[in-house]
Regions:
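Transmembrane-helix signature of polytopic, membrane-embedded enzymes
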Residues: 76-98, 134
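Polar, glycine-rich mid-to-C-terminal structural blocks
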Residues: 189-247, 258
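Contiguous transmembrane helix-bundle modules in multi-pass membrane proteins
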Residues: 109-119, 126, 130-144, 155-157, ...
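Membrane-interface coil-to-helix junctions
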Residues: 1-72, 94-106, 110-117, 121, ...
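Helix-to-loop transition at the C-terminal end of transmembrane segments
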Residues: 1-14, 208-223, 477-486, 554-557
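Extracytoplasmic/lumenal acceptor-recognition loop(s) of multi-pass membrane glycoenzymes
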Residues: 245-250, 259-293, 484-489, 539-565, ...
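Active-site-proximal, structured, solvent-exposed surfaces of multi-pass membrane proteins
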Residues: 357, 722, 747-875
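Transmembrane-helix signature of membrane-embedded glycosylation machinery that interfaces
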Residues: 75-84, 124-127, 131, 363, ...
Length: 875
């Protein structure tokens, strides 16, 4: 068994393209579309674990727990640097390592998020040290920690770096106040800005390789980065970036786990073995909902007002004051409502009711100016982190509130996708406040003054009343589950299931209230008992129990042997010499085949078996050439454009199409009307595998294929697809990209007879049908393709893989010019004769060595500090 990983499944990390240590020197993903460059592996903690745990199975088993342990240790170091006692540090570390947001992301396949938290804690610790001694050395180490955070979290690391900058400035401004001196705000701010500059420089150098590869693969040439100023383009960009905004009511998930459910598939088959029943735990909120659905719901309300009769587009247009054409489009959206994403849940936001209770305690005590529990600096720090938590929550609301609009136009924020990411620093701040809260409890328990006794009595009474009210409220809500069920049913769930989900939400609310009451009881015992340590330990165990119970639904497992050792004849056939032809699914409705293809085969089996597909699993930011190519070959409502589907497959070496047996005639008639080059090879059916574990309610892993002449599905072979490599004696030079796309899409153009070259070379002088010779692929690897060619005349070798400036080519061992052909493909010019050609993916690695040097320098500085501190303590 391995831990479930949605974003890094075994199939993906087992593919040839991602093998270590090669990805440190460039990552070319060859299994989707025509291939494309992905961010190279960064020399950080996460990839170091990947290098250490070379075997994919071992990696999935151990990477997540190791990352969470690193987070806990880093948080402990941060709290110790704050000057908190060991028990406070331990509870703070537990709150960090068991935090639901961190754990849920790690169990979703993103344990690197926990490392971003860890490096931020480390950066904060060294910033605190810089305020006391050796400021420039400690700030440099803090900067390297920030750089590691950028490596681990990309835009999450960048977001945390902004908070770190604010923390540095705040720390330097309040530092002089410790001694009671009147601070010079300008001078203190200047030192803070200088500190930010040092941290930024060190972070930039440490993460230079990551920044370089991200700019080259995710931002430069990205179609989502187009700066169109039309209102429609701005609205589309806003919707794209804010789709994953936190609905305001769902902020309750921060203090009540499971109030809106957990995963979309809760309970899964593995949940039946857990101690607590998760029946009804399916997520029913609106996180990630497609913005189009808001418009659809508005139209549905208007249509409902007409009563039972059918509404004509003209009537809808009149009511909404729009054109008939727009009304027709809106009604079409309503009819296809099910195609849009209703909701998605891949993470939990529960901080822990005990953690939240302690954080609130710290803030309330800090706001009490008469209390002496915290020093002036500690009080200011608590209020700083309280402001960070509140501001981050408000920004996480994104499109659901006005706050994010104030910063949306600023650099970085106008490209950062998903405002829910602001919940990361909110959780971080609450964890810090939790540590302060525990420390405050212990300090108050040790005070033996009249004022402290009065404060303890008031606090215990107040906390007990609040906890009792919350418990009573939760019982009332639980008893009114029918009302909640009606609301859930309105979100698109059957009433019977909605009742179960409402019961689950009520149960979660009651359990959370009980944990709150227990935490109040333990806090009271800490305050009223001289021997507080046992009850502080009890509080630590309560944090573990609360967060462990809440995290259980996120912890899922895969039986990788059962999943990937599936004897599937179709997969076996496609995995033989996969570079000879790409695979896709029929664009026509294919029922269960389409679902099996999209969810199980494309995302898992194809990757595991290195099968190349023209389809893409996920590409939130599509490259500009990719987007332009796909847009030009998209079928429109005009039936005369059907041939574009066949032309797209022809140009992209898409040789295998999975579809219904009835699709063959349609393909030859519509997609290839002049040549009818689609043929059926093997018919097959989909059924249970012999060793199916869930025969009564099968999941995708339980299914396989069986070749059968009477099967409803077939593997269609497209004889017209261009080979992966081909020699051309006749080519046309065209440096205008739009003109190139028009030529390629023209029905009169024959891709087998003529090549379009988009580089500045001499036009061909050969006749159109002159023989050019032969070419063979002798070895095909993701980052190196070896070929032999026997050119009978001057020719261009076309390799039907995606062009990138980071690909190089040699002919007979000598460097040659890499040509861009057919808009997006690679090519090289050959003289007559026999040749050995090698294409290699070799992006620059200068920044990798800069990052490594910076990290080694950081270790050197850290060693210097450790040695000097030990020497100082010895003296």
């Amino acid at each position: 068994m391995t831990l479930f990983s949605n974003d890094g499944p075994l199939g993906s990390i087992s593919s040839d393209a991602i093998k270590m240590p090669g990805t440190f020197f460039g990552y070319w993903h060859d299994l989707n579309w025509l291939g494309y460059e992905q961010p190279s592996a960064s020399p950080g903690i996460y990839m170091a674990l990947g290098l250490l745990l070379q075997k994919s199975v071992l990696y999935l088993k151990w990477c997540t727990p190791i990352c969470l342990v690193i987070l806990g240790l880093s948080a402990w170091f941060f709290f110790r640097t704050l000057g908190l006692r060991n028990l406070s540090c331990t509870i703070g570390a537990i709150a960090a390592a068991y935090n639901m947001e961190v754990v849920s992301y790690a169990c979703w396949g993103l344990p690197s998020r926990s490392l971003t938290f860890a490096t931020t804690f480390l950066a904060g610790a060294f910033i605190l040290r810089a305020l006391e001694s050796r400021p420039w050395i400690n700030l440099t180490i803090a900067g390297i920690c920030v750089g590691l955070g950028l490596m681990e979290g990309y835009d999450i690391g960048a977001l945390f770096s902004l908070y770190i900058a604010a923390f540095i400035l705040f720390g330097f401004v309040i530092k002089p106040l410790e001694s009671g001196k009147q601070t010079n705000l300008g001078r203190a701010s200047g030192r803070g800005i200088a500190g930010i500059a040092v941290v930024a420089l060190a972070a930039g150098l440490a993460s230079s390789q990551t920044i370089s590869t991200l700019v080259g693969t995710q931002l430069k040439g990205s179609s989502s980065g187009n700066s169109e100023n039309t209102q429609a383009a701005k609205e589309q960009q806003w919707n794209f970036l804010t789709q994953w905004s936190l609905p305001k009511m769902e902020a309750l998930r921060i203090v009540v786990p499971g109030l809106y459910g957990y995963r979309l598939d809760t309970p899964s088959s593995y949940d039946s073995e857990k101690l607590v029943s998760l029946e009804g735990g399916r997520y029913w909120g609106s996180m990630g909902q497609d913005p189009v659905l808001e418009q659809i719901n508005e139209v549905e309300e208007i249509i409902a007002a007409f009563g039972q009769r059918n509404v004509l587009p003209g009537e809808l247009a009149q009511v909404m004051n729009i054109s008939v054409n727009q009304a027709t489009q809106l009604m079409s959206l309503v009819q296809n409502k099910g195609r849009f994403l209703q909701r998605h849940s891949g993470s939990g936001e529960y901080v822990g009711i005990v953690v939240f209770f302690l954080a609130v305690w710290a803030i309330l005590i800090a706001l009490n100016k008469r209390s002496s529990l915290y020093s002036g600096t500690e009080r200011r720090m608590i209020l700083f982190w309280g402001f960070v938590a509140l501001a981050s929550l408000l920004l996480a609301f994104g499109k659901h509130a006005v706050f994010y609009q104030f910063i949306y136009q600023l650099p970085f924020f106008n490209t950062m996708r998903n405002t829910i990411k602001f919940l990361h620093p909110m959780h971080f701040a609450l964890i810090v406040l939790c540590g302060y809260g525990v420390e405050g409890l212990i300090r108050l328990a040790k005070l033996e003054t009249k004022e402290s006794s009065k404060l303890i009595r008031k606090w215990i009474i107040g906390s007990s009343i609040v906890a009792s009210i919350i418990l009573l409220f939760s019982l009332i809500i639980s008893s009114a589950k029918k009302v909640l069920a009606q609301h859930i049913a309105g979100q698109g769930f059957p009433l019977e299931e909605a009742l179960t989900m409402a019961s689950f939400a009520g149960k979660e609310l009651i359990i959370t209230s009980i944990f709150l009451i227990i935490s109040v009881f333990l806090a009271a015992k800490i305050l009223k008992t001289k021997a507080a340590s046992p009850f502080v330990i009890g509080l630590a165990l309560l944090v573990i129990a609360d967060l462990t119970r809440a995290n259980l639904p996120w912890i899922q497992y895969d039986d990788y042997k059962y999943k990937y050792n599936n004897k599937n004849p179709l997969i076996d056939q496609l995995s033989q010499s996969p570079h000879k032809g790409r695979v896709t699914i029929s664009p026509l409705p294919s029922g269960s085949l389409g679902q099996l293809y999209g969810i199980e085969w494309l995302q898992h089996q194809f990757l595991y078996n290195n099968i190349q597909s023209i389809d893409i699993v996920q590409a939130p930011r599509m490259s500009a050439d990719h987007e332009a190519f796909e847009r030009r070959f998209t079928i429109t409502g005009d039936t005369n454009t059907h041939y574009l589907a066949g032309r797209r497959w022809e140009l992209t070496n898409t040789r295998w199409i999975l579809g219904s047996t009835n699709d063959l005639a349609f393909f030859n008639q519509k997609f290839d009307p002049k040549k009818s080059r689609f043929t059926s090879t093997n018919s097959f059916l989909i059924g249970l595998r012999p060793d199916a574990r869930n025969p009564n309610s099968p999941v995708y892993e339980d299914l396989t294929t069986q070749f059968n002449p009477t099967g409803p599905y077939c593997l269609i072979h497209f004889d017209g697809a261009l080979p992966r490599a081909k020699l051309y004696s006749h080519w046309e030079v065209q440096t205008n990209d739009l003109a190139t796309l028009e030529i390629l899409a023209s029905q009169e153009f024959d891709p087998h007879a003529k090549l379009i070259v988009n580089s500045q070379i001499e036009p061909s002088a050969a006749a159109p049908n002159k023989a050019s010779g032969s070419v063979n692929i002798t070895e095909y690897k993701p980052k190196e393709i070896q070929l032999t060619a026997d050119a009978t005349t001057e020719a261009i070798l076309l390799l039907n893989d995606h062009w990138s400036p980071h690909w190089n080519v040699t002919v007979n061992g000598q460097p040659a010019e890499l040509l861009r052909c057919n808009f997006v493909m690679r090519g090289v010019q050959l003289k007559p004769g026999q040749h050995e050609i090698v294409f290699r993916f070799q992006p620059p690695v200068t920044w990798l060595y800069v990052s490594l040097t910076s990290l080694l320098s950081g270790f050197g500085l850290l060693g210097f500090i450790v040695v000097r501190d030990r020497k100082k303590s010895t003296d």
